[in-house]
A protein has these predicted regions:
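Internal catalytic-core helix/loop-beta-alpha segment
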Residues: 95, 102-104, 127-141
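Active-site beta-strand/loop signature of hydrolases that rely on acidic residues for catalysis
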Residues: 3-9, 22-44, 103, 114, ...
Length: 192
């Protein structure tokens, strides 16, 4: 059985060694990190290199690292005990293509398409969140004969309520704890 752990590091540089140690103690075959920075990536790679054969981050795919500022400074990293090949065929139509790290991992049983994503939060990036989710959906809707794993931080839903289920960011939870669709969302109707 293949064991995978996905973890948002919350771009905390000082806590990286402790977070990574906690994950390594669980001995996963594949690790998928989100909110990795250029600086933290080199630290993570150094720590994991003794136990993981293949390690890649989304920054390696950029033609220029000059875009790694502001909300685009955060990326993803995949580490595995198996051989991997970066999937350079980017089938995702989205504003920030580096928000999906796609690799093919060759396990003893199979080659798996493995996707690690970090969806930008809508509160600070407006429509980029929706466009990224749509691009991810459309890209994965393309048929593949290989097994696939998708993991990451999707920055959704807002909440999961026992009585009402999933509550999206397009809803407001009233004082009685009941979710209602917002009439105006971020000073707009939500229509495009």
């Amino acid at each position: 059985m293949l064991k995978c752990i996905t973890w948002n590091l919350a771009h905390r540089l000082k806590k990286n060694p402790k977070q990574i140690k906690a994950i390594e103690e669980r001995n996963p075959d594949i690790i998928a990190f989100q909110e990795v920075t250029l600086e933290s990536s080199s630290i993570i790679k150094k720590i994991l290199s003794s136990n993981y054969r293949s390690i890649v981050d989304s920054f390696e795919l950029l033609s220029s690292q000059s875009v790694c500022v502001g909300p685009r400074r955060l990326g993803e990293l995949i580490a595995t005990k198996y051989d991997l090949k970066i999937n350079l065929e980017n089938k995702f139509s989205m504003p920030w293509k580096e928000r999906v790290l796609a690799v093919n991992i060759k396990t003893p049983q199979d080659t798996i398409e493995f996707y690690n994503t970090y969806i930008p939060p809508g509160s600070t990036n407006r429509w980029k969140k929706i466009e990224t989710l749509e691009g991810l959906y459309k890209g994965l809707a393309i048929h593949s004969k290989r097994k696939r794993i998708l993991c990451g931080d999707f920055n959704t839903p807002q909440d999961e309520l026992l009585k009402y289920g999933v509550c999206t960011f397009a809803q407001k939870i009233n004082k009685k704890g009941v979710p209602r669709l917002r009439k105006i969302f971020r000073r707009g109707s939500g229509n495009r």
